[in-house]
């Protein structure tokens, strides 16, 4: 197959949905029927091929997106299986960025669930064409038609029904193909590998005709010639219908809806046919956005094998046998083992060593890969998620991915000194794999703080640290970093004297402390500082060599404020006068005097406690708005704005961080899991006096 031609035969797809809708089971069946897997893996037995981490097989949920390659008809399908739990939406986001199309799996009983809405919005953001598979049609309470209505109501989507179920619940035995107008029935005893076509059952004829008419009404709008033919009463051929469904799917004019039961092995082969027939190849996507490094100009790059090499790294994974693996999606050109390329984001060269095609966690070495391929590279040194790898002579940076800020943090400390070094290595490796996981050190407590997207996210990180890196750690409760400041100008004149035989100590300082916002002639470079020091000594009242001692003393002592021992910020100290002794004065004496002046003077400045305020954004369906706003108000939140976005509402509020612990769980229960939120640090603000009293009492 020529390389140019090959692009038409590739489908890069994701399978995404709410937790438990049956994504992983659907993927397992696809691998089985395309011949990649000789035994079907069942999720509830902990044997699914795609769920290859220990934690996944125990919990029966997918945490990392496993990538695998299979063939159907004459097409190559690269599948990314993505997690459905809200704490792992970053994995979904990464996958969607590099996919050309997606299959959204819905639970036939539950319909459109909360995480389905989140994933759908993420797919909208990256303009990913998609089709819908209503799964679990064999389950008690499954209702295909209700699911179709929910697609319209909850997602604002335009569903195009191309199949109807034959039989319901335990009597579900097949589908009606509305393109061919035939029933497709599966033999139970053949594990779904055998199925046959027959005429539509008599009791379903009318329903099939009704939905066939709806299908034709929607697709003929995309082609004037076919519309004329249809309106004049001529038959529209199956090939014409398929061509128009493909056109409408790629342009997101509508979303084809199919049905089946992956667990009962029904409906998977027609789903594969639809992936090949209707979802785009890299050529259909045509271009990718990016920036030319030499000119700095934004431009569109054609997806083509003949163009210079450009690829996006979308996932880092630690493989126990190969080491660090970097998953890349190649957008243009080709690479071979041994080639040197450049990471244009970091401006570092990388040599391509082993190149692997992945099948869940089995691997196959390849020597060459080209546009449209998704491969894993072993041994890259500097490349992280979101980086571009490019041809050295024609350098480009592809559109970067955006990652949400972590919303929950915990302190961790190693149980023993042996764990100390291992913990540092483990956390840095895990952070390289997952951009939504951050590690920092709290300079006040010296503790290591880990931050993530939710409690399950951090629980799994700690679990992986224990299993993969053999690190035992103690986990602390989340903490808030309070600060202190003064609210009015105060002045202190302090003399430090010490005589106890031998050389004495003497230093006198007169200092004015003032809140930064009240300083009239503040220099621009000082406006964002927490502490500003200035000396206005004239005529040598304090010799020049002693003045740094005053600044050092103030800088050290301000780390423990006068209310509850939190760092003092947003103030200016001006040294206006002082006195010294020829023999007994020293830098140390002036440092001690400055510290004592701070302790005595600051309480006169009406000090106040400050707390971090977060900007919180909640995206919620309309019906939960009242409860969510009421809850934010009860958390001392101030609503900033409320705006519609699609068929959801976006509420922005400023809320103290101390009130946000446990909010993930509250929001889930208030909205039945349908709302989502993100938060970023906004500013420090005064703590109300009654809350400040409680904080002081705890110190």
Swiss-Prot record:
Keyword presence, Cytoplasm: yes
Any one GO molecular function term: GTP binding
Family matches, as SMART domains: EFG_C (SM00838), EFG_IV (SM00889)
UniProt entry tagged with the keyword Signal: no
Primary site of residence: cytoplasm
The entry's keywords: Cytoplasm, Elongation factor, GTP-binding, Nucleotide-binding, Protein biosynthesis
Protein name listed in UniProt: Elongation factor G
Species of the source: Rickettsia rickettsii (strain Sheila Smith)
Gene: fusA
């Amino acid at each position: 197959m020529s390389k140019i031609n090959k692009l038409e035969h590739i489908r890069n797809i994701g399978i995404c949905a709410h937790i438990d809708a049956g994504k992983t089971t659907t993927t397992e069946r696809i691998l089985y029927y395309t011949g990649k897997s000789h035994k079907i893996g069942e999720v509830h037995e902990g044997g699914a091929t795609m769920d290859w981490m220990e934690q996944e097989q125990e919990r029966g949920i997918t945490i990392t997106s496993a990538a695998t390659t299979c063939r159907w008809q004459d097409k190559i399908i690269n599948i990314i299986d993505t997690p459905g739990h809200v704490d792992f939406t970053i994995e979904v986001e990464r996958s969607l960025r590099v996919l050309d199309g997606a299959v959204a799996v819905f639970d036939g009983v539950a319909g459109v669930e909360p995480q389905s809405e989140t994933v759908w919005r993420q797919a909208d953001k990256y303009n990913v064409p998609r089709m819908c598979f209503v799964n679990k049609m064999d389950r008690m309470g499954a209702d295909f038609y209700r699911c179709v209505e929910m697609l319209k109501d909850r997602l604002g989507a335009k569903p195009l029904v191309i199949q109807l179920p034959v039989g319901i619940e335990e009597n579900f035995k097949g589908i009606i193909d509305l393109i061919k107008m035939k029933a497709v029935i599966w033999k139970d005893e053949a594990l779904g590998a055998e199925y046959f076509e027959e005429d539509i059952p008599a009791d379903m004829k009318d329903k099939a005709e009704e939905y066939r008419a709806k299908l034709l009404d929607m697709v003929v709008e995309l082609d004037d010639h076919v519309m004329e033919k249809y309106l004049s009463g001529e038959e529209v051929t199956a090939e014409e219908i398929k061509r128009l469904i493909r056109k409408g799917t790629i342009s997101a004019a509508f979303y084809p809806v199919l049905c089946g039961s992956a667990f009962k092995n029904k409906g998977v082969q027609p789903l594969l046919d639809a992936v090949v027939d209707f979802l785009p190849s890299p050529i259909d996507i045509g271009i990718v956005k990016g920036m030319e490094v030499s000119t700095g100009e934004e431009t569109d790059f054609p997806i083509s094998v003949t163009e210079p090499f450009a690829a996006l790294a979308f996932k880092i994974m630690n493989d126990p046998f190969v080491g660090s693996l970097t998953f890349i999606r190649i957008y243009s050109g080709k690479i071979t083992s041994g080639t040197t390329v450049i990471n244009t984001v970091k401006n570092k060269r990388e040599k391509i060593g082993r190149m692997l095609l992945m099948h869940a966690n089995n691997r196959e070495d390849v020597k060459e890969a080209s546009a449209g391929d998704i491969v894993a590279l072993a041994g890259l040194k500097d490349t992280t998620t979101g980086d571009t790898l490019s041809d050295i002579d024609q350098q480009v940076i592809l559109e970067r991915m955006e990652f949400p800020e972590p919303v929950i943090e915990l302190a961790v400390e190693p149980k023993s000194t042996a764990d100390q070094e291992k913990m540092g290595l483990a956390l840095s490796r895990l952070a390289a794999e997952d951009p939504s996981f951050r590690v920092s050190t709290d300079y006040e407590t010296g503790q290591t703080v880990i931050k993530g997207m939710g409690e399950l996210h951090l629980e799994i990180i700690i679990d992986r640290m224990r299993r993969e890196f053999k690190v035992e750690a103690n986990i602390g409760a989340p903490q808030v970093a309070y600060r202190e400041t003064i609210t009015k100008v105060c002045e202190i004149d302090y003399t430090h004297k010490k005589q106890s035989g031998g050389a004495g100590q003497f230093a006198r300082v007169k200092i004015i402390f003032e809140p930064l916002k009240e300083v009239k002639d503040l220099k621009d470079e000082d406006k964002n500082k927490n502490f500003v020091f200035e000396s206005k000594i004239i005529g040598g009242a304090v010799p020049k060599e002693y003045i740094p001692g005053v600044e050092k003393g103030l800088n050290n002592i301000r780390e423990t404020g006068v209310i509850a021992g939190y760092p003092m910020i947003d103030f200016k100290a001006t040294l206006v006068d002082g006195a010294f002794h020829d023999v007994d004065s020293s830098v140390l004496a002036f440092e001690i005097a400055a510290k004592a002046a701070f302790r005595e003077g600051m309480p006169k400045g009406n000090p106040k406690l400050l707390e971090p305020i977060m900007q919180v954004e909640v995206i919620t369906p309309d019906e939960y708005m009242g409860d969510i706003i009421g809850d934010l108000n009860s958390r001392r939140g101030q609503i900033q704005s409320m705006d519609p976005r699609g068929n959801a509402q976006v509420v922005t509020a400023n809320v103290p961080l101390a009130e946000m612990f446990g909010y993930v769980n509250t929001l889930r229960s208030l909205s039945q899991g349908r709302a989502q939120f993100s938060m970023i640090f906004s500013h420090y603000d005064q703590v109300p006096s009654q809350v400040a009293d409680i904080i002081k009492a705890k110190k």
